[in-house]
Amino acid sequence: MSTREIRIATRKSALALWQAEYVKARLEQAHPGLLVTLVPMVSRGDKLLDAPLAKIGGKGLFVKELETALLDNEADIAVHSMKDVPMDFPEGLGLYCICEREDPRDAFVSNTFDSLEALPAGSIVGTSSLRRQAQLLARRPDLQIRFLRGNVNTRLAKLDAGEYDAIILAAAGLIRLGFEDRITSTISVDDSLPAGGQGAVGIECRSADVEIHALLAPLHHADTADRVVAERALNKHLNGGCQVPIACYAVLEGDQLWLRGLVGQPSGGTLLVADARAPRTAAETLGVQVAEDLLSQGAEAILKEVYGEAGHP
């Protein structure tokens, strides 16, 4: 294989740059002499910080500009947080690598209280996620959920300024940015089921670029990929973007996948849950099966209501 340059399209946020640098280091380690450069870009989701994500159209909000760079040959690969990646790709692009997953759990962050259970009634909790909101209010309907957007630093600064009693963030982002000491406690997946793909990094590239596919192969983590494939299949079957109250999480038990799924009203009034097991070779079928279970329980009505409130189909 000829030595060549790989250009990585990435968002400019600290977490996105960390992910791109991580992929850069892994590629350089796997292929000595390979030149890897970053092409930082600003996505629509990075520009629109004054509105809830669900109201500005969640699907592809953080990836479209990166995909355009791939299609225009301004970059060779795009590095994404898997929970932000839409279910369908533009013609000519595809997902060709999923890296090993970091901690997939949600993190409880507070300067005053040790855990979610310790929060007094009426406490203000910040999150930008309807998925987290639904599960939080189902457990603690006495809490006030307030809108929280911005990068990790901005969110922590708002907490430190006293705007919130606690905030909920993805543990993976805090760990990757060196803020592990800010995690007051992690919330178990039983209490807050993660978003599909949470904690995993995916790499998108041109479908015809087989040389790039080969360079990415050493970074692919099959165990993570099978879990994420099941989660994404559930999301796709429910027509879910990254900003709807859908949660799903798969674990490997030997050669079996166990997938749990959840759809909840943002008010926490109703939480629908389903789970199933299947061989890891049937990850996609498993995702559809659990999604069908949720639909049979009434998930479609909940999701239609959420999409209607957000003002998009």
UniProtKB/Swiss-Prot annotation:
EC number of this enzyme: 2.5.1.61
Keywords: Porphyrin biosynthesis, Transferase
Cofactor(s) recorded in Swiss-Prot or TrEMBL: dipyrromethane
Record's cofactor remark: Binds 1 dipyrromethane group covalently.
Enzyme's top EC category: transferase
Sites of S-(dipyrrolylmethanemethyl)cysteine modification: 242
A GO term for molecular function: hydroxymethylbilane synthase activity
GO CC annotation, single: cytoplasm
Catalysed reaction, written as an equation: 4 porphobilinogen + H2O = hydroxymethylbilane + 4 NH4(+)
Pfam families: Porphobil_deam, Porphobil_deamC
CDD domains: PBP2_EcHMBS_like
Pathway linked to the protein: Porphyrin-containing compound metabolism; protoporphyrin-IX biosynthesis; coproporphyrinogen-III from 5-aminolevulinate: step 2/4
InterPro entries named in the record: HemC, Porphobilin_deaminase_cofac_BS, Porphobilin_deaminase_N, Porphobilinogen_deaminase_C, Porphobilinogen_deaminase_C_sf
Domain of life the protein comes from: Bacteria
Function: Tetrapolymerization of the monopyrrole PBG into the hydroxymethylbilane pre-uroporphyrinogen in several discrete steps.
Family affiliation: Belongs to the HMBS family.
Assembly and interaction partners: Monomer.
Miscellaneous comment text of the record: The porphobilinogen subunits are added to the dipyrromethane group.
Name of the featured protein: Porphobilinogen deaminase
Organism encoding this protein: Pseudomonas putida (strain GB-1)
Underlying gene: hemC
